[in-house]
């Protein structure tokens, strides 16, 4: 049995915490036992995760008393691998690993520049969630031989073309209306306003835009769309997989993005996708096959590809079909679990 200690200092439950949940739940329980070290009050404590939760104080990168406490836990529980994800826990995990002589896997989920390569280079292996993230890590000083890509996996059995909720019908729209969506936290970097402007300026009949998510830009965006037609804000939804298949196009116009899991989930539901050409979105969207990429911030280019997909039903269907195959082949949750288990088995030798 290989005992693993996951550490996560983040209190929220976003994309990277979803990935960690999928990995933990997918690991072969006859080979791996997982302890999940979290801050008190972490939202992950409320989730269905097949592990043993442990509360640590991970609010500071260097707290000698907490580091010694974690070292004691590692030795008492025969931990073979420490897995870290965020800035503070990444530094703590790297230090504990060196003190205890335990392998450390640091996963980088974000496209944002790292502040220092040191905690990464102190780790045994550094996992990037896409080629773009891996390349940026190496560019910023992380040793190339430590870096390994493991794509974020999508649950293709959960995200399917079938749907329980018809979102068009929910808003009194006919089935021939082309449903466009963006599924993202409402923050400025996601560039919602660019999509809203592009959609509104096209002003095409039989099309509607659904904005799914919540966040700091909620009030601003409600105000921004109040005089615009056929734009609906759904707020935060926990049932996205139940209605995504009832829509037709998914757009992510982010200024910065790692892998863009929302686009992969949409492709798994056979939606055509559109993404800005930043970070790992060029990997999430197979340009010209599962959807289109457009130049970051270029509204006219976004309008062009959006109009093309709204007006061409056959193209949408063709791209949706290709997209699901593409996700199942490259971004399946099974492949992510397999690659992660292989890494852990190698490090535990």
Label each region the model flagged:
Residues 14-22, 178, 182-201, 216-222, ...:
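A conserved mid-protein helix/loop that constitutes part of the nucleotide-sugar donor-binding site
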Residues 6-66, 215-217:
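N-terminal strand-loop element at the rim of the active site
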Residues 98-131:
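A conserved, positively charged/aromatic
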Residues 236, 255:
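Aromatic "clamp/platform" in nucleotide-sugar-dependent glycosyltransferases that forms part
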Residues 160-173, 315:
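A short helix/loop element that forms part of the nucleotide-sugar donor recognition site in Leloir-type
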Residues 301, 308, 315-330, 336-345:
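A short, well-ordered alpha-helix in the C-terminal region of glycosyltransferases
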Residues 38, 272-275, 285:
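Short hydrophobic beta-strand element within catalytic cores of glycosyltransferases
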Residues 287-288, 292-299, 308-314:
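Conserved acidic donor-binding segment of nucleotide-sugar-dependent glycosyltransferases
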């Amino acid at each position: 049995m290989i005992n693993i200690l996951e550490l996560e200092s983040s209190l929220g439950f976003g994309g990277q915490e979803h990935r960690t949940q999928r990995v933990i739940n997918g690991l072969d329980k006859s080979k791996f036992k997982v302890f999940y070290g979290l801050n008190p009050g972490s939202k992950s404590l409320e989730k269905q995760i097949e592990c043993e939760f442990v509360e640590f104080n991970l609010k500071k990168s260097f707290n000698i008393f907490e580091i010694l406490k974690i070292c004691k836990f590692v030795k008492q529980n025969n931990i073979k691998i420490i897995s870290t994800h965020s800035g503070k826990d990444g530094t703590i995990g790297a230090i504990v690993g060196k003190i205890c002589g335990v392998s450390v896997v640091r996963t980088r989920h974000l496209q944002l520049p790292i502040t220092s390569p040191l905690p990464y280079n102190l780790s045994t292996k550094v996992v990037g969630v896409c080629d773009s993230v891996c390349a940026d890590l190496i560019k910023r000083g992380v040793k190339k031989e430590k870096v390994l890509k493991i794509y974020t996996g999508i649950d293709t059995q959960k995200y399917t073309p079938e749907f329980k909720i018809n979102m068009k019908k929910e808003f009194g729209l006919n089935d021939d209306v082309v449903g466009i969506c963006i599924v993202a936290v409402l923050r400025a970097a996601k560039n919602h306003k660019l999509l809203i402007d592009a959609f509104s300026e096209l002003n095409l009949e039989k099309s509607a835009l659904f904005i799914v998510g919540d966040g700091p830009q909620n009030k601003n965006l409600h105000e921004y769309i109040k005089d615009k037609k056929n734009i609906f804000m759904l707020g935060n939804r926990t049932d996205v997989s139940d209605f995504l298949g009832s829509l037709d196009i998914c757009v992510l116009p982010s200024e910065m993005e790692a892998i863009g899991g929302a686009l992969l989930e949409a492709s798994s539901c056979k939606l055509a996708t559109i993404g800005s050409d930043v970070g790992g979105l060029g990997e999430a969207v197979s340009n010209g096959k599962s959807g289109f990429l457009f130049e970051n911030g270029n509204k006219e280019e976004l309008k062009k590809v959006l109009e093309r997909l709204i007006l061409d039903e056959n193209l949408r269907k063709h791209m949706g079909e290709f997209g699901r195959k593409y996700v199942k082949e490259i971004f399946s949750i099974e492949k992510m679990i397999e690659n992660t288990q292989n890494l852990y088995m190698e490090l535990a030798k």
